[in-house]
Amino acid sequence: MASSSMSSQSSGSWTAKQNKAFEQALATYDQDTPNRWQNVAKVVGGKTTEEVKRHYELLVQDINSIENGHVPFPNYRTSGGCTNGRLSQEEKRMRNMRLQ
């Protein structure tokens, strides 16, 4: 019974808390650390060694895609009132600024 609850806990998406623990564990356990993925999985909690390793591999793929220009930059400009004119005011200020 414990294994079924563990597998349901470990499958699926990652919580923000798990992602933060994952980042911290990667900083603690570098690639030369023996049993790196087991240690990372222990810190993250609720994930298997294989899931942690796969999560890392996907992260590396995402970084490579971004660095190779395969991911377009987002367009944050809006046309309309959702920013209540703040963006255009900020743009005006930036245009009037002079670098010293």
From Swiss-Prot:
It is found in: Nucleus. InterPro entries: Homeodomain-like_sf (IPR009057), RADIALIS-like (IPR044636), SANT/Myb (IPR001005), SANT_dom (IPR017884). It comes from the Eukaryota. This is Protein RADIALIS-like 1. Transmembrane segments: none annotated. Its main location: nucleus. Probable transcription factor.
